[in-house]
Amino acid sequence: MNPEFLPASGASRTVSIGDVVTEAGVTIFDAELRYFAFYDSPDGAADYAEFSAGPEPGLSPEERPIVLIEHALTGDGNAADWWADMVGPNKPIDTTRYLVLCANVLGGCQGSTGPSSPHPDGQAWGSRFPGLSIRDMVTAERQLLERVGVTKIHALIGASMGGARVLEWSLMHPEMINAALPIAVSARASAWQIGLQSSQIRFIEADPAWHGGDYYDTGEVPSHGLGQARRIAHLTYRGELEVDERFGVDPQNGENPYGPYRDPHQRFAVESYLDRQAEKLVARFDAGSYVVLTDALNRHDVGRSRGGMNAALGSCEVPTMVVGVDTDILYPLHQQEHLSRNLGDFIGMSKITSPTGHDGFLIESRQMGQALAKFLAKAEIIAEGTEGAEGTARA
């Protein structure tokens, strides 16, 4: 990586990546992506034998193998925050050994160009922001890496929507990737997923404050619609048994949902929980970005224009390990098992056992850490083999 583009560890930088042309032929002028970098000095680092796989510490950050992390739908580039148990010195993704990068996705609202960003005419893009595919996001990230001087990704890791980007990266730019790890994702959106996700979009679009997507200069925010979308989405991120065990049919403290008439202020405990999740998202995320990114998930299909899903997976040349969660109702485990049966260079699968559902990759730190350790150990072996083969060829 060009050291001129390397921010301080834990900090971010926003760079212009030029125009991005979508699959559908729409140009996003002078797009920007914001990215975070994580790296630490090995001085004084304790031995962490359980997760010891990786290059020897001591290389300067820009010389280290690069781990590129792809965040999920409403995530951001600050991977050491939302994946704090996984990213850091002497953690599974060891920042004393690797240079870890994570970019905010195109279409988002965390510093990269999206619907809330200024159009060249000075107004917000709003409804003029084009529909995106997962491939468009990868195109933007590829332009970012080219801009900052990255030519090789040692390990590509992503979950949920990030996992979809991992799969597309592997098919679009296999020459750049040493090894890949998609987590809790599928090869394409299922009809069930599209139904769930499009229903969330409809709630936002039905909010009077949406104004057809052009609400940015109105002083209004479609917070009700975004909150309703989050309530639906959050249930799909958790496990059914876990939610029932936590809340059951208990009323919220001080409220009585068993009264003679329906009263929205008299809630079950689970309703209060979902209301709180909605409030938190509304406070930090843009409804326009939520629509664009959720629509991109609906469009996800690795088989489109590649001869079908299985043919596309079979053509994948990147050594790929897969992780799934046994209680995931958003991306059920059978979808990761399908990946494992059809990927062209499949190198293993790990199953996270958890009552917490899709969010298990965030919650089950011990199991996720073990899976990452296995993957990064495999990535090292692959890299050593590649270097050996290249040396033999040169000889």
From Swiss-Prot:
Keyword terms: Acyltransferase, Amino-acid biosynthesis, Cytoplasm, Methionine biosynthesis, Transferase
Pfam families in alphabetical order: Abhydrolase_1 (PF00561)
Matches recorded under Gene3D superfamilies: alpha/beta hydrolase (3.40.50.1820)
Positions that bind substrate: R230, D359
SUPFAM superfamilies attached to this UniProt entry: alpha/beta-Hydrolases
Broad EC category: transferase
EC number(s) reported in the record: 2.3.1.31
Pathway per the UniProt entry: Amino-acid biosynthesis; L-methionine biosynthesis via de novo pathway; O-acetyl-L-homoserine from L-homoserine: step 1/1
GO biological process: homoserine metabolic process; methionine biosynthetic process
GO CC annotation, single: cytoplasm
GO molecular function: homoserine O-acetyltransferase activity
Catalytic activity: L-homoserine + acetyl-CoA = O-acetyl-L-homoserine + CoA
Keyword Glycoprotein part of the UniProt annotation: no
Location of the protein in the cell: Cytoplasm
Superkingdom: Bacteria
Keyword set includes Ribosomal protein: no
InterPro entries assigned: AB_hydrolase_1, AB_hydrolase_fold, HAT_MetX-like
Catalytic site positions: S160 (nucleophile), D328, H358
Span of domain AB hydrolase-1: 65-363
Alphabetical list of PANTHER family matching this protein: HOMOSERINE O-ACETYLTRANSFERASE
The family this protein is said to belong to: Belongs to the AB hydrolase superfamily. MetX family.
Function: Transfers an acetyl group from acetyl-CoA to L-homoserine, forming acetyl-L-homoserine.
HAMAP family found in the cross-reference section: MetX_acyltransf (MF_00296)
Subunit record text: Homodimer.
Protein's name in the database: Homoserine O-acetyltransferase
Lineage per the UniProt record: Bacteria, Bacillati, Actinomycetota, Actinomycetes, Mycobacteriales
